[in-house]
């Protein structure tokens, strides 16, 4: 018997704001427990929420980038439940009138394009964090309470784990390049819940849904869905039935584990939030935000390949993060050759970042200085070997490349009036190499170049030396 899967995803993005959604408390990842809270976050009597309007702006950016319909009027609702990390005993979210509906993302899987619908996206506040100690006590940290979230709910349009993976990859890149979120799963600024059901092929009625929450990597999403497909198939083939339930993914075993069985849909007794008035989102404001929307990663890819002539692989490496793409764009705008800039970004810069476990914002290299260094290579002022020393200094201290080269006597020797006598002497002193060259041994010229480089302590222009050596050897 063949089965068909139906998969839906709910993705929470932490919006990149300086303060929380309903209070002026700052938002800083990794801050000491309960140091970024105030009376609103603690739900003290008499306190009222104040909406951070920047949350709407960031949400609208994502809505525009995913072809979603932005509702002209939106308001907040209360989702009622009790938990220690939720001091109000309700969460402020959007249930009846979300920010946007009816969007889509196009993905390509196994060479075929498919449109995945977005049911809705809504804004809500995050809850605090519970920590259970080994001493029998539990601790509550409310730094995260009130951090703004954008939840993007897909339609159940995905039919296998690979489609879900492709959807997540594309959604993550779209959100990242709008600047609405930094989408760092390791810091919790992107979290994924999945639901999956299977049914016999040809059956129209959907099967019973199983949820998996807070999956912390794309790989876990793919592996958990693949396992759950097989598990549900085995249950049905054995004559059993699927329970409406929530399961978690066990990374060590690669299996999903039952957490709780549901008897029906949860009743959170949603009702409109009485302390926040409905908000009207004007078309004028939407149009203004659309003008501010950064260029999408897909448009950038077209520019990199078709305008700058980069290889698709190099373009994709640059587009792994918005920071990398922005840095490259700024370097090219400052006059860097696009191909050389991409090569330096994808090798030396990324290598340094990976080796030192830092990001572009942590180092002192600027796009302008990278462009200056590339120009020094292009005009023959320094060799690629010297450039690596210049790069190390510029990354560490932000030193101007041109000044550093001049102050340290690193200017490449390209003067033919100086190099020609050296070339003639090296050729005269190495008759065996001349004979080897005439016999077609390419290594001979490499040896001679090495002798020149040794005499000049690496300052001779290798291209110029090669050219002069070839001319001299051909004349013998």
From Swiss-Prot:
Keyword Ligase in annotation: yes
GO molecular function: asparaginyl-tRNA synthase (glutamine-hydrolyzing) activity; ATP binding; glutaminyl-tRNA synthase (glutamine-hydrolyzing) activity
SUPFAM superfamilies registered for this protein in UniProt: GatB/YqeY motif, Glutamine synthetase/guanido kinase
Catalytic activity field: L-glutamyl-tRNA(Gln) + L-glutamine + ATP + H2O = L-glutaminyl-tRNA(Gln) + L-glutamate + ADP + phosphate + H(+); L-aspartyl-tRNA(Asn) + L-glutamine + ATP + H2O = L-asparaginyl-tRNA(Asn) + L-glutamate + ADP + phosphate + 2 H(+)
E.C. number: 6.3.5.-
Highest taxon in the source lineage: Bacteria
InterPro entries: Asn/Gln-tRNA_amidoTrfase_suB/E (IPR017959), Asn/Gln-tRNA_Trfase_suB/E_cat (IPR006075), Asn/Gln_amidotransferase (IPR018027), Asn/Gln_tRNA_amidoTrase-B-like (IPR003789), GatB (IPR004413), GatB_C_1 (IPR042114), GatB_Yqey_C_2 (IPR023168), Gln-tRNA_amidoTrfase_suB_CS (IPR017958)
This protein's UniProt keywords: ATP-binding, Ligase, Nucleotide-binding, Protein biosynthesis
GO biological process terms held by the UniProt record: glutaminyl-tRNAGln biosynthesis via transamidation; translation
Keyword Nucleotide-binding: yes
Alphabetized PANTHER family for the sequence: GLUTAMYL-TRNA GLN AMIDOTRANSFERASE SUBUNIT B MITOCHONDRIAL AND PROKARYOTIC PET112-RELATED (PTHR11659), GLUTAMYL-TRNA(GLN) AMIDOTRANSFERASE SUBUNIT B, MITOCHONDRIAL (PTHR11659:SF0)
Oligomer status and interactors: Heterotrimer of A, B and C subunits.
Task of the protein: Allows the formation of correctly charged Asn-tRNA(Asn) or Gln-tRNA(Gln) through the transamidation of misacylated Asp-tRNA(Asn) or Glu-tRNA(Gln) in organisms which lack either or both of asparaginyl-tRNA or glutaminyl-tRNA synthetases. The reaction takes place in the presence of glutamine and ATP through an activated phospho-Asp-tRNA(Asn) or phospho-Glu-tRNA(Gln).
Family recorded in the similarity comment: Belongs to the GatB/GatE family. GatB subfamily.
Name of protein: Aspartyl/glutamyl-tRNA(Asn/Gln) amidotransferase subunit B
Species per Swiss-Prot/TrEMBL record: Lactobacillus acidophilus (strain ATCC 700396 / NCK56 / N2 / NCFM)
Gene encoding the protein: gatB
